[in-house]
Amino acid sequence: MSEDSRGDSRAESAKDLEKQLRLRVCVLSELQKTERDYVGTLEFLVSAFLHRMNQCAASKVDKNVTEETVKMLFSNIEDILAVHKEFLKVVEECLHPEPNAQQEVGTCFLHFKDKFRIYDEYCSNHEKAQKLLLELNKIRTIRTFLLNCMLLGGRKNTDVPLEGYLVTPIQRICKYPLILKELLKRTPRKHSDYAAVMEALQAMKAVCSNINEAKRQMEKLEVLEEWQSHIEGWEGSNITDTCTEMLMCGVLLKISSGNIQERVFFLFDNLLVYCKRKHRRLKNSKASTDGHRYLFRGRINTEVMEVENVDDGTADFHSSGHIVVNGWKIHNTAKNKWFVCMAKTPEEKHEWFEAILKERERRKGLKLGMEQDTWVMISEQGEKLYKMMCRQGNLIKDRKRKLTTFPKCFLGSEFVSWLLEIGEIHRPEEGVHLGQALLENGIIHHVTDKHQFKPEQMLYRFRYDDGTFYPRNEMQDVISKGVRLYCRLHSLFTPVIRDKDYHLRTYKSVVMANKLIDWLIAQGDCRTREEAMIFGVGLCDNGFMHHVLEKSEFKDEPLLFRFFSDEEMEGSNMKHRLMKHDLKVVENVIAKSLLIKSNEGSYGFGLEDKNKVPIIKLVEKGSNAEMAGMEVGKKIFAINGDLVFMRPFNEVDCFLKSCLNSRKPLRVLVSTKPRETVKIPDSADGLGFQIRGFGPSVVHAVGRGTVAAAAGLHPGQCIIKVNGINVSKETHASVIAHVTACRKYRRPTKQDSIQWVYNSIESAQEDLQKSHSKPPGDEAGDAFDCKVEEVIDKFNTMAIIDGKKEHVSLTVDNVHLEYGVVYEYDSTAGIKCNVVEKMIEPKGFFSLTAKILEALAKSDEHFVQNCTSLNSLNEVIPTDLQSKFSALCSERIEHLCQRISSYKKFSRVLKNRAWPTFKQAKSKISPLHSSDFCPTNCHVNVMEVSYPKTSTSLGSAFGVQLDSRKHNSHDKENKSSEQGKLSPMVYIQHTITTMAAPSGLSLGQQDGHGLRYLLKEEDLETQDIYQKLLGKLQTALKEVEMCVCQIDDLLSSITYSPKLERKTSEGIIPTDSDNEKGERNSKRVCFNVAGDEQEDSGHDTISNRDSYSDCNSNRNSIASFTSICSSQCSSYFHSDEMDSGDELPLSVRISHDKQDKIHSCLEHLFSQVDSITNLLKGQAVVRAFDQTKYLTPGRGLQEFQQEMEPKLSCPKRLRLHIKQDPWNLPSSVRTLAQNIRKFVEEVKCRLLLALLEYSDSETQLRRDMVFCQTLVATVCAFSEQLMAALNQMFDNSKENEMETWEASRRWLDQIANAGVLFHFQSLLSPNLTDEQAMLEDTLVALFDLEKVSFYFKPSEEEPLVANVPLTYQAEGSRQALKVYFYIDSYHFEQLPQRLKNGGGFKIHPVLFAQALESMEGYYYRDNVSVEEFQAQINAASLEKVKQYNQKLRAFYLDKSNSPPNSTSKAAYVDKLMRPLNALDELYRLVASFIRSKRTAACANTACSASGVGLLSVSSELCNRLGACHIIMCSSGVHRCTLSVTLEQAIILARSHGLPPRYIMQATDVMRKQGARVQNTAKNLGVRDRTPQSAPRLYKLCEPPPPAGEE
């Protein structure tokens, strides 16, 4: 080697040495810096958590925080801190004043190697600590406490949770070998520290190897470090600094900047790295194996990485025109750069997507959970501090600064000092952290919004005090607002979103950003352009819309933007296959719902696993499962809302065991077929079933444990064929003959012991009555209800027999089938969500109508009975008018009797009706029929959503699974090994009922009007007023007569001896128990009615009140009477004025007890007389006299009042009687009662006569018809939502921080106290005559519906009918109809106490009407436009919704122990009503829609551009108030389908994380492939009357364009 070459070599080695030493300094600096950070973390753990938890454990504030808990969580963390403080001190001494290449640190590690063994205890305890913390995090108070500790410690709350801090010591001890390895690599062999570092490396490896947990961690980190060593040109921090494991790796094609390159991608937790594979020339050499394998090309932090699917065949801007197959886009949001990746196969793409979603789920779930929990904790703490500061008095007050007064504010310095005083914090810096957290979370703010929180003389104010507090999370706010905005934009008759030509290219369905901003401001959504621009950016960030070329953010410029959902709708983004996140159909379902109760620790059935699906293996004879209709071999779809057919079989077993342990009844969705063949073996004990009816005959009852039940025959099934012969049109007797013809055993035994299960509760009750009343063998009247076993042999000749058979084969049609579809989608948080959409025919549909008709018939019968008293009017009717009067009465009463007869007949027919189980839309004119009282096409649309329960307090699909916080695979093994434990799930049910609008208009009357037109406003009210006045007068009259009898009894008993008096009081007069005293002396007191109150239709005037305030004048006279009695009694008994027959003992005196009773009776009597007098003087009586004066020209109201006044002046006359002659009081009272009866009877007759005039038979029939239709649909809709709440599956808004069981309980409390809100949505077009009449009929039906109340009773323990959780009963009159819900005992116990005790509640119906086409230019009547007519309906409904909301707020205010301060009270109620805090915006929108319809047509202005937006907004408004929903159109088919599917998609997007871009895609899938398809099939002859000009939101999506077209 030459001198020159040696010199060059030495120079090069010198450079290498210099570089090596320079890197050594970097490693030493890193060691020192990370050690300082680590000690800081340990100090934070000890001061912020350990010390505070020790204080909490010592004070025993929370039973969950004990000294053992704290020890288990933190182990010997304080000892570790002490060691590391010392270690840090030694390291810093070695590296003083700053690190350089010659300094030595190896000896530091050698000195502390034994002390580091202290980690053994901590690491071995860590797994227990993790499990404990996981359990503690489920307790809300503990979670809040831990977040508070972190906050006061000053750490940013969403960075790292406590579990992250607890794992830090393990990560640190494992990091030392890696640091020492790197240090050794950078230390020359001749360096004085080399040997010490090498020894320290081996020592620290030994320390880690002796600790199992640390060893595992170290091995994982070593693998990552080894991997990084093979990357040439690595940039950025080491992989071990941010990552702990590799999740996925593989070769992908990367398209960026117009180039297609093959790259190797590596996905870690928190990082995506891509490299170029390095080509090696010497493939077999050792150097090539040990050297670099890859060239570093880039890295993306997954925190700023977004992934978007690309459909096969797509070629766009980001793919540089290249066609993408098996590809997806990756967006680096930090640099705003995009590139496209392509996998080799669809399976590989799926694997990458799963890995990316899993990584995002883990990271986002942790962050979202922390954010939500922190916000809740801060808001609660802010409210608590606010109340305390208000009570303090001198902290929050008006303060002056520079001639300006700032109201209700406080000083930052005073706030921190006060927190120290009350012990909320321990150090001033904690107060600063708390103040800043309150400011960042929107609880307080600087009065001029110029400063963060500082403990100085700066003014701050709670946002409660200036109305700027917004309790909702920003992300959900954008989601719900975005969904609302999308629907409104696509509800316009003049679209804002439309195709646009721009630079020689047509862009479909786009809107310019500046035009959208104009629209938002014009609509009132935003006040300024800046606010609108921020909203637009939020929409883009949350996946609603994007720039058409992906080149710009949302700006106030003429830039084209498109909603993602419109791409799906146009078909432009759906060429070949659907995307991963969209709503996909998993399975079509034809099933029936079974209700199975546990009995003696068993449900009575067993399952087996066949092809990964649970199949019924066995059904126990006579069990509840057999009674419900379980059959061997059937597939089970769902149990209690859980889709068990998608679970592993061992999980299904665990799920059933947990249900059995909780004694829950099972709601099982089991597969079935519309038509089945059942083979029943012949038996000596009989076939075990009964049939009823004909054309077709129906299985009336099946015996439990019989051969029929075992074969799979169920009550309600329709018999189509017997032994292959069609009998669907045969008579009842013929069907029985076919069944019995082929049997061997004609006279079965043991029939009395059979326990029958019936088709309906009415059938069961009817049979029970027959069995009790009818002697054996009596077959009279039983032609349509005959037991198969008892058929007479003469029918045998009617059957075609091919010899005797071993079984009877029945082909039957199943009833109450549920047609459904199971969907799945990946939510915005990456969670797999499952949806079951079903369309259900309500059970008990016809029998409920029958019971309502029965109640109406009874009410009419009672009215007819009352009309018999009309003859008393003959005294005041002139002779020449009496014939007219008699003819009028007889004619009207005859019509009433005909109606009563018809209703009873219809009721009988409906009770026996079994097929079909729903009422189809009519296509032909038909005479009046019983089914005309049933709602047409009434179906309940049920959508059940289920997904894994999340870690966030919010509980919505925006979070992720709790277990995703665990980062190692060891937890998965634990999870699979734990038997009986399933990951928690969320189950929520949404119900919407659809029907044809109520109508009493026959199809032949094309130009007829509806009831609202035919009946005047005063007519509607007058009838109710008269009926209520009748009831009040009769009730008051009974009370008066009862008082008279009691006074007679009490005063007559005084004439007996004391001994007899005691007997009398024991025998005739009931003893005064506490309850009776309360009833007589407290409840029956004064009832003073003002004249203007008697027409109040909502409240009973004559009601019991616990107040004597209205009776002072009466009490004076009563008091004087009792005092006179007691003082004059002796002298009176000894006077000569006594009758000769009245021989009384000298010792008789009126006891105080008797005085009290007489006092109470008189007081009650006087109050009733006052009430009756006021009623007789009221406006209703004036109107009745005026209406009937043509029959009594000689006696009008004036004559009646002149005669009444002197005879009913009760207080004056009776006071005189009491003073002058108290012992003649009984006769005075009787005279008064007779006079009252006389006047009441006269008024009663006039009222009845007036009512007879109103009883137009045709109008009332029509009114009853639409009322029945509406009430039946209302009861069915409410029943489904009620059962969802009782099954703890109701939640009207997942935006609130509430579990479903709590939301269900709260809704039940809400309806028990405020009543139930019913939202009726009309899609009728009032410009069409028949639909206008329907709308008018509906208005009157809803008016009558307000008089209905709901009550609840427990049903019988032993059910006679299968799969019916509740039945109905109707009682009362048209003015006060009561519907009773009979509920099984398990569900009855879930009701609020008030309802269990017999309390009821009212219905609050509201109707929002909006045609799906513009009504401009159409007129209703009297120059009132159709738009104005709809606006009047909607304005009245909005007012009712506001009134209901006020009742709701009042209920929560009464329920809450809220503070006296009105502002803080409002804030408290806002928190209690968290789902309702969007109401102000919704009220504003609905009001603006109504106003826009009433203004003059101004098509070019934004104010009129509401379209049909009212439908979706009013629906959301009512939904947030917990309303039941009923959607109506002319047939209940086409328009209802469009609306209900849209509502379901909106609910999924708003509450369950359906990505916003798939709203229309999901709607379209439900319309074309969902459960509603079956409704169209059931009504094939019904014409689709959806307007052609309906907005695009109510149109089907366009099909994809042909291949090759853009």
Swiss-Prot record:
Domain DH stretches: 23-214
The residues covered by the PDZ domain are 592-671, 677-754
Q: Could you name the Gene Ontology cellular component terms for this entry?
A: cytosol; plasma membrane
Where in the numbering of this chain does the PH domain appear?
Answer: 245-361
Supply the alphabetized keyword list: Guanine-nucleotide releasing factor, Repeat
Per the record, the domain of life is: Eukaryota
- Tell me the Pfam families matching this sequence: DEP (PF00610), PDZ (PF00595), RhoGEF (PF00621), SOS1_NGEF_PH (PF22697)
Documented effect of changing residue 1571 to E: In a colorectal cancer sample; somatic mutation
Region Disordered: what ranges?
1581-1606
Q: Which SMART domains match?
A: DEP, PDZ, PH, RhoGEF
Repeat as UniProt keyword: yes
What GO terms describe the biological role, i.e. biological process, of this protein?
Answer: adult locomotory behavior; dendrite morphogenesis; G protein-coupled receptor signaling pathway; negative regulation of TOR signaling; phosphatidylinositol 3-kinase/protein kinase B signal transduction; regulation of small GTPase mediated signal transduction
**Which SUPFAM superfamilies does the entry link to?**
DBL homology domain (DH-domain), PDZ domain-like, PH domain-like, Winged helix' DNA-binding domain
Which GO-annotated molecular functions does the record name?
Answer: GTPase activator activity; guanyl-nucleotide exchange factor activity; protein serine/threonine kinase inhibitor activity
Residues forming the DEP domain are: 390-464, 491-566
Found, by tissue, as follows:
Isoform 1 is highly expressed in skeletal muscle, heart and placenta, absent from peripheral blood leukocytes. Isoform 2 is expressed in skeletal muscle, kidney, small intestine, and placenta. Isoform 3 is expressed in the heart.
Ranges that cross the membrane: none
Q: What is known of its domains?
A: PH domain confers substrate specificity and recognition. Able to discriminate between RAC1, RHOA, and CDC42. DH domain alone was unable to confer substrate specificity and recognition.
Task performed by this protein: Functions as a RAC1 guanine nucleotide exchange factor (GEF), activating Rac proteins by exchanging bound GDP for free GTP. Its activity is synergistically activated by phosphatidylinositol 3,4,5-trisphosphate and the beta gamma subunits of heterotrimeric G protein. Mediates the activation of RAC1 in a PI3K-dependent manner. May be an important mediator of Rac signaling, acting directly downstream of both G protein-coupled receptors and phosphoinositide 3-kinase.
- How would you summarize the oligomeric state and partners of this protein? Interacts with RAC1.
The entry's protein name is Phosphatidylinositol 3,4,5-trisphosphate-dependent Rac exchanger 2 protein
- Originating organism: Homo sapiens
Name of the coding gene? PREX2
